[in-house]
Each structure stands twice: as C-alpha cells, then as structure tokens.
Amino acid sequence: MHLIDYLLLLLVGLLALSHGQLHVEHDGESCSNSSHQQILETGEGSPSLKIAPANADFAFRFYYLIASETPGKNIFFSPLSISAAYAMLSLGACSHSRSQILEGLGFNLTELSESDVHRGFQHLLHTLNLPGHGLETRVGSALFLSHNLKFLAKFLNDTMTFYEAKLFHTNFYDTVGTIQLINDHVKKETRGKIVDLVSELKKDVLMVLVNYIYFKALWEKPFISSRTTPKDFYVDENTTVRVPMMLQDQEHHWYLHDRYLPCSVLRMDYKGDTTVFFILPNQGKMGEIEEVLTPEMLMRWNNLLQKRNFYKKLELHFPKFSISGSYVLDQILPRLGFTDLFSKRADLSGITKQQKLEASKSFHKATLDVDEAGTEAAAATSFAIKFFSAQTNRHILRFNRPFLVVIFSTSTQSVLFLGKVVDPTKQ
C-alpha cells in the first residue's frame, strides 16, 4: 500500500490584559504599513521567494537554541507555522514592538519592506493551500476575540487578507465554552489529529491566536508493510531500542556521502513538490554537523543531489515511529530578539485602542507520525549508512541511529518542518 504521511503543527499565542493602563476607546488606524493586494505571481520573482531566506534563517536559529538546551532529545517543529503566526501578529504591533517581531523573524527591514513581508506570506500560504495530486497541505490561522472588545478594522481585515485568518468572537469569562470553541475548531481543521489543545484559559485573556499546518502526502516510492520487521536502533553508546524497520530494496534514491563533512544525506520525494532530507552524521559527529547546518548547507546538498551520479539503487532500512515537540515560545523567542513582546513594554495598540494588550503565553506543538500501512503516517526517520559493493554493487542504508530531518517545499523554497530524531520510541 502507499505510505501516507501526516504532519500537523499547532501554534497558539494568547494575548492578555496587562495590569492597569486602560485606554479610552476611539477610532484609529492600525500601525501596519501593509496594503491589500492579491499576489499570484510565480517563478523567481514571486513574493514568497523574497521572504524565503529570512524564514530559513529563523528556522535554523530556532533549531540551534533548542538543540543547545535539550541535548540528546528529539526535536520537531514547524518554523513556518511560528513565522507566519508572529508575522501576522506584527500587523497589530506598533513602533519598537513591530520592528522587533519582524527583525526577530530574520527580516532586514532596510532591504525588505513590511508590505513585502506580508505579501510574501500571502503568496506563500496561497501556494501551499493549492490542491495537488497526492499532496494536501493546509495552512491556516484563527483569531478568537473577546466579544466585549472593539478591535481595529484594519488589523482584522489585514489578518484575513494576508494570512487567511478566520475570526471568532467569544466570551472569555465563559472559559469552558471558549476552550471548547477553540479545541473544536482545531480538531476540525486538523482532521481530528489534534484534540484538547487548550486545557485552561485565564479570564483576563482577550485574544487567542491559533496557527496550524496540516500536511498529507504520498511517498513517490512507498514501502510494503509485510516486509517490516523489528530491528535495533542505537540511540547512543549505552542505549539500544527496538523499532519496526521498513525495508525497500528495489528502488533508486538520491543520496551522497559528503566528502568534506562527516555525514551522509538522503533525499526522498513526496508526490507533489515537497521533499524531505535525512542527514545522518557519522558516529559521534552529531554536534559537528549541527554546527554547520545552515540554509546555505541545505542548498549545497540539494544542488548536489540533482546530479545523476548520486542517483543509486539502495537497500533501504527505514523505521516507523511517532514523535512530537512542544515548546513554550514566550520563554524561547526573547532570546531570538523578541525582547519586549512578552513584557509590559509591548506595544500592540494596532489591535485595539480600548485596552493595553501584552502577549502572555505562546506555545507550539508539532507531531510527526510514520508508518507504512496507509492509515496515518508522517515524515521523519533515522538511519545509519553502510556501503557494500564488492559482490553486488548495491548500497545499503540502515536507518538505525540519530539523524536530522528537513521537510522542504520546492516551489516556495520553504522549510516546512525541521527536527532531530534521537530516540524514535520517545513521543
């Protein structure tokens, strides 16, 4: 049967009242300089390609920080989900808060205008949400707004225009009803994969921002479930776990052993225009490879793996598993340049003039599942690599130790997901 892959990402940010500092309501304009325009261009000049370098830079900066603080742990997140959510939030930020958000996301505002950023995301989300054969990607946002508060029309219109956000008004004093409203929407949009995302809310919350990515794709070259058998996976020198290992031995794949770096790289394609890179460091060299893991290095590997001499027949051993990642963004992002957003210095007056808002809590959850049965699966794997050519001239790749994974949209040049699989038996 075909291997079906699901990747689901949720990011939730909560904006709550700061203590005191209430403003009298009056009509006003958002601080954003964006202007409404439908952007449908494609090719090298498309708006989404203008923001791709900054998005990639943010992805790897976020990864470095997480990896340095959680050595020996699985990592999995969607940089695109985080970037889109906070770029959308910047529509309601003013003065220093707006520039801190956009610069924290990696955008050089002397080279790229704010309008370019938002039109870039508009084009990116539109492109990813287009239907495709064998590939379904759904990227969406929702704003849950207090029914007692008057929000600026420009902020609401811009979030819908550029980020395809859906708006819901709710009574946050009815915490049970609001939690159910949020969770029901998330459950519906993720096809039931994410349930009970929000477990509690404080009564002083005025707005909840939700961003999600749902990804479902078929491998170009699927596995056969009857060939899956239990095998060892070597977490480290002292830890070995058993995992169901899939097998494929009649197909050609794109892979290389880097002559300058201690790692091997495998590229596997989904139907559609999405690709996944699996990067396997040599034994004990994970830290060395993480240090050179940059957007430029990813492009170098991608360019090399276009050459025919790297297309070879493989005996491929590939584990099936489930992992997830949960991150408290209000603790992480201040170290990436978002210095004021989660403090009383935050200026979110482009959202409403009625109350002073501050971002209180923000978290991100990502899940990745892999199996070959054609039910629910996802894109992540780990492997070790060996070469045997003396008798059969066949290369053997055994995915049996920690590796890195990058899931990449070719048409938008965007890193959709980034992670590290250290122990595939850990959720």
Swiss-Prot record:
Principal location: secreted
Cleaved signal peptide residues: 1-20
CC terms in the record's Gene Ontology section: extracellular space
Domain of life: Eukaryota
GO molecular function, one term: serine-type endopeptidase inhibitor activity
Keywords: Glycoprotein, Protease inhibitor, Secreted, Serine protease inhibitor, Signal
Locations listed in the record: Secreted
Glycosylated sites: 33, 108, 157, 238
Assembly notes: Monomer and some homodimers.
Name by which UniProt lists this protein: Kallistatin
Gene that this polypeptide is encoded by: SERPINA4
